Amino acid sequence: MKKINLQTRRMVNAKADPNYEGFQTNLLFGLDELCEKFIDKNSTILEIGCYNGISTSLFCYYAKEVDGVDIKISKKLFDLRNQVDNLTLYEQASRTYLKEAISQNKKYDLIYLDGNHSYNAVKNEILLAQQLLKPNGILSGHDMVEGNKRRNNGVLKAVYEVYPEIEKGDIRLYRFSDSSWAIKHL
């Protein structure tokens, strides 16, 4: 299997958007933490919201198979797909893909939500994505930030509402330095 190598991974991230180099460095560090903790060479991953492929490139490096879903597939994402053989891209709305995947009984080891960050979108994606997880699968996502009323607080609200067990301590919420989060399903 052709895998993206470290040099290619760095190149993809450096080319993704040179104006956000500092952000990408932080993003890569947090995603590396998440990947090292939860992904192995046999993992199957679904990523909702791929944008320019920064996180997608890391998932391809760590996992056996990656399905990427985005409403608009960028040229950079198509370029990444040509560098690896473990990436399948779907250009459609997340809700549409999730419902189709459920009807096809697809299952994933890890699902990463990074599309629409509004409360309703995140909540609906979580409820659908739960049905696609393998036993002991990981539901995760990006942009769980606190104290920012203008940006992405829909993620925080939706996660805590769907998983009230977090506040009781019955479910562990993993947090990473790039604002990624993860919950292990039993």
Residue ranges and their predicted role:
Residues 1-112, 116-186:
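A short alpha-helical cap/connector motif
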